[in-house]
From Swiss-Prot:
It comes from the Eukaryota. Belongs to the cytochrome c-type heme lyase family. This is Holocytochrome-c1 synthase. Residues 1-64 are annotated as: Disordered. Residues 35-46 have a biased composition (Polar residues). It is an enzyme of class 4 (lyase). It is found in: Mitochondrion inner membrane. GO terms for molecular function: holocytochrome-c synthase activity; metal ion binding. It holds the Pfam family Cyto_heme_lyase. Keywords: Heme, Iron, Lyase, Membrane, Metal-binding, Mitochondrion, Mitochondrion inner membrane. Residues 11-27 have a biased composition (Basic and acidic residues).
Length: 224
């Protein structure tokens, strides 16, 4: 089960949810090695100062939003792609995107990333990152086809819904690498109140691939 401090929920209308599922639900997305014109945030420190190269004439915003997420080995934050970059990255992957969808998908993508970061900061509170100015994000990737052990247990043993997406984020805590995993769930429309908007739930927790991951989860389970 997801504890209250592990899950974030974000109400979205059904059309927005469908767009998110279509654009995020079936492919792994590039991580920190992706160039600045790929789907996720810019990974190249120089990309903040460069004018992106565009290859289509589609009329979409070229404005980019600077995130609140600090970047490892940089004094700057990660920067989100513009609507046009997002669209062209999908075109490059042969996803046949609808340009009108970008005005919905891009803000949702950015907002959910910010929520993920806030939950990671909650896990990292008083863990030593304050000594060097705070934790930073090193890299990230998405793979909706790969179930986490918790998601597998929930779906196969408890017969609950599978997450529609999964992300893996790696953060730097004053030189120590800590891995986090995020499962994305949504309410079943058949169960949801017809008067309410569907919800996207974020199950954010440290990965159990290191002693630090086990330690963080153990102390959190004790209420620390």
């Amino acid at each position: 089960m997801m504890s209250s401090d592990q899950q974030g929920k974000c109400p979205v209308d059904e059309e927005t949810k469908k767009l998110w599922l279509r654009e995020h639900g079936n492919e792994a997305h590039p991580g920190a090695t992706a160039p600045g014109n790929q789907l996720e945030c810019s990974a190249n420190p120089q990309d903040n100062d460069k004018t992106p190269e565009y290859h289509t004439t589609v009329d979409l915003s070229q404005s980019r939003e600077v995130s609140t997420i600090p970047r490892t080995n940089s004094d700057r934050n990660w920067i989100y792609p513009s609507e046009k970059q997002f669209y062209e990255a999908m075109m490059k992957k042969n996803w046949d995107p609808n340009s009108d969808d970008m005005k919905v998908v891009v803000p949702l993508h950015n907002s959910i990333n910010e929520r993920v970061w806030n939950y990671i900061k909650s896990w990292e509170d008083k863990q030593g990152g304050e000594a060097c100015g705070g934790i930073k994000l090193t890299n990230f990737k998405g793979d909706s086809k790969k179930l986490t052990p918790r998601a597998w247990f929930r779906s196969r043993i408890l017969h609950l819904a599978k997450p529609f997406d999964r992300h893996d984020w790696q953060i730097d805590r004053c030189g120590k690498t800590v891995d986090y995993v995020i499962d994305f769930y949504s309410t079943d429309l058949n169960d949801a109140n017809s008067q309410q908007q569907p919800l996207i739930y974020l199950d954010v927790r440290p990965k159990l691939n290191s002693f630090e991951g086990f330690r963080l989860r153990f102390w959190k389970s004790l209420g620390f």
